[in-house]
Amino acid sequence: MQTVNYRKGLGAMSVCFFVWGFQPLYWYMCTNVCGEIDTFFIMACRIIWAAVACLCILKVQGKLPQLWAVFKDKQVLKREMPASVLLFGDWLVYLWAVQNGRVLECSLGYYIQPLVVFALGAVIFREKMNWRHFVIIAIVVVGIVFSTSGFGGVPYVTIALALMFSIYAAIKKSLTIDSIVSTTSEILMMVPVALLFILLFRMGDNGMGSMTVIKQLLMIGGGVITGLPMVFYSIGVRHLPLMTTGICQYISPSLSIICGAIMGEALTREKLVSFLFIWTGVILYVLNTVYEEKQKKKTAAE
């Protein structure tokens, strides 16, 4: 039974990160098809349709009462509101980067994000660090510094995504509510802003006035590919060890590199060297995690 659950969890988690990894191609297609429609309008549509998709998922799962409970709990809202702001910023920067041919910077940001989370854990939650952790972080920092040459300047997209999502993850760590319920509440908090933006600035030809059936379907699809992976993620988290989940999350940025190549971004020598430093840090981080997990089991057995 345990093996079946593990396979179920691994399959669900793989689907989740594969969808996230290939998302740049979807948003790139939206940009090409929608043409004159800008990042902000696509962002607003993504929020609205993601909210619809997540609400439908919660309805099917019978978790809507849990969602309404979130909005009645002031202590939970104090954490969910800043999480919503950070998620909004992450989505906006990500969409802008995809539309402006900077997918590789996104990939770099999501590679280092788990390491930034670890560093934040040491600072905020007083989690212990040993000399191996400092070596890993130093290697990653060198990679980021080197990326200023490969990307023609400071990789603001990389830094912004890594920091925002890391702080977001730190906030989520302090929450005990269901992951889909939590994310849905954060998206619902964005909906008024999205609706107000469309009503005030995008009712003409630069927005709703130019929406054909195809464009509308693409926007709806954007909501689906935002909400649906969360279902698979929640299944995976329930059936997989935390260490396996941590390793799986590197699927997404790896696939994003492929997306960048398909979209015409050049992986220059300078960029490759930067990625090599990051990959080295990631590999050492994973190996160290495996080693520490084995040591814990060994200590517990004694």
Locate each region found by the language model.
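Hydrophobic/aromatic residues within transmembrane alpha-helices
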Residues: C30, I42, R46, M81, ...
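Glycine-/small-residue-enriched transmembrane alpha-helix faces in small-molecule transporters
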Residues: M1-F41, V142-S174, C259, K297-E302
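Membrane-interface helix termini and inter-helical loops of multi-pass transporters
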Residues: L25-T39, Q66-A69, Q99-R102, I144-V145, ...
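C-terminal transmembrane-helix exit sites in multi-pass transporters
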Residues: W96, Q113-R132, S254-V273
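Helix-helix packing/entry segments at the starts of transmembrane helices
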Residues: C45, S107-I112, S179-M189, G227-A261
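Hydrophobic alpha-helical transmembrane segments of multi-pass membrane transport proteins
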Residues: S14-F22, Y26, M81-V98, A160-I171, ...
